[in-house]
């Protein structure tokens, strides 16, 4: 069985992430499967691009290609630049502050080779806390810092994966184009600021509908994602949750189908929050009151902000026909 070549794309925009990138590159070079190509797309910082090149040369990493995005800034634009340079049959995306398990590439290549109905793969994104005291955060809200809340032990078909750990066959881009450049972070998402996200969700929806193939969550394709303390601040959570609600309302309208409940993933998560998270947090009130109160507070904050974002899009669409946001 011939295994495919994998092009792995990561993007970054600031020297503050240089150490993270070097650690990511080291984890990529430690992969058990060697038929990989690594493409790093830097933007907004020529110094960053130069430092990454120097690091790859110093460490003798010949499979590392460093590009500089001189066009429109943003995660989607940078990824699209990388896609244009990729030579692999599989094109994968990881965040610059992620670390891959040593068998990540091997498991990815094998999964594609064994099942031609799979057009995309994703897998567990495990939080690597800056401080262990942050681990009180409920799993149901791991999506706030781009980690997965799924705890499945067997492969399962999903609507989409997270950009911290996602890949597609080349045919997905040949048939469906690239990421929409008006979606996705424009500055790393540090503040959770005013920006439409959901670029992986939107692309995944297009790919599944046009190829009629599956996107699969595979429990053995694992990465760790660094979670810095700022991501648990009220300000970050509030903005991140608002825009999550806004973009999901947009997708629910624009990709509505009688054959598929586009927001079924969110509906299942909401049910889990009310049936599992809230009761378990209430049980902790007497034994671990600090943890219980933090969990209940973040639950209220997230639900309120997601609802506000959802209603904001819904109301604005009545007057401004917001489907124009998806074009680009």
Give each language-model segment a name.
Residues 1-29:
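N-proximal low-complexity "stem/linker" segments adjacent to membrane-targeting elements
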Residues 123, 139-159:
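Short, flexible, basic/aromatic active-site loop/helix in glycosyltransferases
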Residues 240-243, 257-328:
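Non-catalytic, C-terminal membrane-associated alpha-helical segments of glycosyltransferases
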Residues 25-68:
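Acidic donor-binding segment of Leloir-type glycosyltransferases
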Residues 91:
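Short aromatic/hydrophobic "clamp" motif used to bind/position activated sugar donors
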Residues 69-86:
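Glycine-rich, basic loop-to-helix element that forms the pyrophosphate-binding segment
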Residues 103-137:
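Conserved donor NDP-sugar-binding/catalytic core segment of glycosyltransferases
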Residues 165-168, 172-177, 183-221:
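A short, conserved alpha-helix in the catalytic core of glycosyltransferases
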